């Protein structure tokens, strides 16, 4: 099991768009990609996350892993990897997010969560770990995760989507933790679980 540190908001790798994974003419993926995917799964599992983008562990490649239920109350989960994902969503509401149903957290903003407006439905297309085409879609928490992880790969954190008082509260939280600078990380399994799982 290889668990690696998760970068914290302010690290440049989190705020820069990732590079697509190179696919050979025969459709094969780089040989070392399988090890990266295994490390991402191990790290996500140790952190009790529902998703993890490669740049959250310092790798600037366009892929994410997930282990997520359709809704917060459900126990059945979907698990996989998407390489070079392309996101499609329903319309994103223009109203203030509901603090009871739209709360969102992030392993790169450990221990914090803020209401975030997201589309109710999302689909991601890309490649699986074998290089075969994959299309996954969902609503609720699963749709939120798809949008969250592809946002990471585009160089954005969910904090960048916050509006109004939630954006102000997030800025205060980042400042109070001393985040927003390069080089900060936490190690799942060694550092305390910031979300209290």
Swiss-Prot record:
Cofactor notes: Binds 1 Fe(2+) ion.
Enzyme active site: 149
Superkingdom, natural source: Bacteria
BP-aspect Gene Ontology terms: co-translational protein modification; translation
Cofactor dependence: Fe(2+)
Key word Oxidoreductase present: no
Gene3D superfamilies (UniProt xref): Peptide deformylase
One Pfam family this sequence matches: Pep_deformylase
GO MF annotation terms: metal ion binding; peptide deformylase activity
Positions of Fe cation binding: 106, 148, 152
Keywords: Hydrolase, Iron, Metal-binding, Protein biosynthesis
Primary enzyme class: hydrolase
Catalysed transformations (reactions): N-terminal N-formyl-L-methionyl-[peptide] + H2O = N-terminal L-methionyl-[peptide] + formate
Documented EC number(s): 3.5.1.88
Listed NCBIfam families: pept_deformyl (TIGR00079), PRK00150.1-3 (NF001159), PRK12846.1-4 (NF009483)
Known function: Removes the formyl group from the N-terminal Met of newly synthesized proteins. Requires at least a dipeptide for an efficient rate of reaction. N-terminal L-methionine is a prerequisite for activity but the enzyme has broad specificity at other positions.
Additional free-text comment from the UniProt record: Was identified as a high-confidence drug target.
Family membership: Belongs to the polypeptide deformylase family.
Official protein name in the record: Peptide deformylase
Name of the gene: def
């Amino acid at each position: 099991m290889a668990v690696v540190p998760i970068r914290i908001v302010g690290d440049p790798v989190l705020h820069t768009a990732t590079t697509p994974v190179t696919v050979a003419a025969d459709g094969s993926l780089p040989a070392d990609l399988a090890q990266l995917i295994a490390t991402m799964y191990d790290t996500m599992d140790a952190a009790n996350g529902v998703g993890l983008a490669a740049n959250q562990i310092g790798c600037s490649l366009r892929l994410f892993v997930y282990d997520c239920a359709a809704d917060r109350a459900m126990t059945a989960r979907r698990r996989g990897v998407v390489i070079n994902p392309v996101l499609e969503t329903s319309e994103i509401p223009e109203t203030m997010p509901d603090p009871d149903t739209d709360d969102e957290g992030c392993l790169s903003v450990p221990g914090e969560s803020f209401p975030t407006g997201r589309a109710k439905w999302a689909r991601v297309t890309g490649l699986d770990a074998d290089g075969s085409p994959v299309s996954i879609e969902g609503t609720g928490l699963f749709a939120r995760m798809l949008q969250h992880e592809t946002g990471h790969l585009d160089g954005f954190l969910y904090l960048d989507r916050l509006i109004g008082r939630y954006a102000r509260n997030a800025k205060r939280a980042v400042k109070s933790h001393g985040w927003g600078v390069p080089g900060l990380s936490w190690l799942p399994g060694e550092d305390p679980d910031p979300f209290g799982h």
